[in-house]
Amino acid sequence: MIKQLQHQAKMEFGTGDIGFNAGAIKEDDNKVGIIIFYNQEPRSIGDTGDIKEGTEVDINDFPVVMKFYRKESIDVVIKALLEAKKEMD
């Protein structure tokens, strides 16, 4: 569930109630990688979310948007996620 708190947006994963989609947008003639996150009804983790792949959306309609201006930034986030996963063992 995505919770909008006073000073942060908190994303709590584990029940399949956060949907997300990835893609790219154009900004000032540059491609920017994006991931949008949204609340949805719980479902099996990994099942298709409410927004089907290829659907055009306005990223301003979502409570959390990650924007990547460099591919290296995506690598850093992946590394952090893998470390968090490892620490859960």
Predicted regions, residues:
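Positively charged, low-complexity terminal tracts
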Residues: 1-89
